[in-house]
């Protein structure tokens, strides 16, 4: 396939059946959003919000874009802004993985960190301050209708098209901004009303399951953390407040069930998914899958259950997800090394290496002149 821009590659991600982890007789499918160009579902929303703002005239040519992000939205925006020529500033709580900061800066964005104690509400308010102070355009991902609309138009339609005439018994997703939850569930209600919509959230932070309203200010927007929020292991999944988009899904009675997920179980699921099915995804993905597999235990035989896998595992290398992965050889790997006699760290060479001998080398005059011309001004690596 040929594309005229990286932006044309967003969406149309694969739907893949699990072969080992699902219960017998139930079909568990995963929507692998890591196949988006920047590796996450947020690429869809980033492109949609920018293009919607361009059409409405809210975003002017060359204007700086600002957004609060746990990482993936910012990375998607960085791709879009790089291609379209908008400067980007993101605010991010210091608790999110360093990989995300580096990716953002590599893509040309500026990253303003906020104290971890201020949580998601803090980084959002910081972005609002910066937008007001400097006249920047804030995409407002937690309340932007374009966020939900793109999933209504694309993500849900892709899933339904892949199944054709086959029924989808349940669709399972976590929630961050709520855009995926709201957009897909609306489309499912219209086109496949028999599909159960399952929301997954951390068992120690049941901001939906508790049934307690989100504190809101006079403007109706979230005002501070939800009283049932607690820190959890799933970065980018279930923030400390119920967003406007998630609240809309609740108010419209689009969510049929809520499944609570244990953080340790999600971590274990990550390793199982990688080593048994070959998927390399992040904690938000495996937490959602853990919820889907739990729900699948009571699903009827032959049911099709779809779980969203929002991003790639590469965003989590410095997090507890990889805390038990050794950088050095394990005992088993050392034993494998010792099972043959050579190329070992503990082996003494049987004979000394042959001394290097000078050999006449023919000099390429053009190459020599090139090196002479650039060596004072450019880094040159010689092999």
Protein language model regions, located:
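A short, small-residue-rich loop immediately preceding and capping a beta-strand
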Residues: 57-94, 167-180, 284-285, 306-309
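Active-site/ligand-binding-proximal alpha/beta "capping" segment
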Residues: 134-178, 183-188, 247-260, 264-278
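Active-site/ligand-binding loops adjacent to catalytic centers
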Residues: 9-12, 124, 134-135, 190-283, ...
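Buried hydrophobic positions in well-ordered alpha/beta secondary-structure cores of metabolic enzymes
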Residues: 14, 30, 42, 65, ...
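Active-site-proximal loop->helix
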Residues: 64, 73-130, 207-222, 244-249, ...
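Positively charged, low-complexity intrinsically disordered leader regions
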Residues: 1-63, 337-338
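Local sequence-structure signature of Cys/Sec-based thiol-disulfide redox active-site neighborhoods
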Residues: 369-383
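Alpha-helix C-terminal capping segments
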Residues: 51-58, 75-87, 105-106, 185-192, ...
């Amino acid at each position: 396939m040929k594309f005229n821009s990286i932006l044309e590659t967003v969406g149309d991600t694969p739907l893949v059946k699990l072969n080992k982890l699902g219960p017998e007789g139930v079909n568990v499918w995963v929507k692998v959003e890591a196949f988006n160009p920047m590796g996450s579902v947020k690429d869809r929303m980033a492109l949609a919000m920018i293009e919607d703002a361009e059409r409405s005239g809210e975003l002017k040519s060359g204007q700086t874009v600002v957004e609060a992000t746990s990482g993936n939205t910012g990375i998607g925006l960085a791709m879009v802004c790089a291609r379209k020529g908008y400067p980007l500033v993101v605010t991010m709580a210091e608790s999110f993985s360093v990989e995300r900061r580096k990716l953002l800066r590599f893509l040309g964005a500026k990253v303003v960190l906020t104290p971890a104690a201020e949580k998601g509400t803090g980084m959002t308010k910081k972005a609002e301050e910066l937008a007001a102070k400097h006249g920047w355009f804030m995409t407002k991902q937690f309340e932007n209708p374009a966020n939900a609309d793109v999933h209504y138009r694309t993500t849900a339609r892709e899933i339904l098209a892949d199944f054709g005439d086959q029924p989808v018994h349940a669709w399972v997703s976590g929630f961050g901004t709520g855009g995926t939850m709201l957009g897909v569930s609306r489309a499912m209600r219209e086109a496949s009303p028999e599909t159960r919509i399952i929301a997954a959230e951390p068992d120690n932070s049941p901001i939906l399951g508790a049934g307690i309203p989100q504190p809101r200010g006079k403007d109706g927007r979230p005002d501070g953390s939800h009283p049932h929020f607690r820190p959890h292991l799933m970065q980018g999944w279930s923030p400390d407040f119920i967003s406007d988009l998630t609240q809309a899904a609740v108010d419209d009675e689009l969510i049929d069930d809520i499944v609570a997920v244990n953080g340790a179980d999600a971590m274990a699921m990550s390793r199982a998914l990688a080593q048994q099915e070959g998927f390399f995804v992040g904690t938000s993905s495996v937490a959602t899958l853990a919820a889907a597999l739990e729900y699948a235990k009571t699903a009827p035989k032959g049911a099709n259950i779809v779980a969203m896998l929002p991003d790639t595992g590469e965003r989590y290398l410095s997090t507890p997800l990889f805390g038990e992965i050794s950088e050095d050889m394990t005992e088993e790997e050392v034993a494998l090394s010792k099972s043959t006699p050579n190329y070992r760290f503990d082996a003494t060479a049987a004979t000394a290496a042959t001394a290097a001998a000078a050999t006449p080398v023919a000099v390429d005059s053009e190459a020599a002149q090139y090196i002479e011309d650039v060596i004072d001004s450019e880094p040159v690596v010689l092999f």
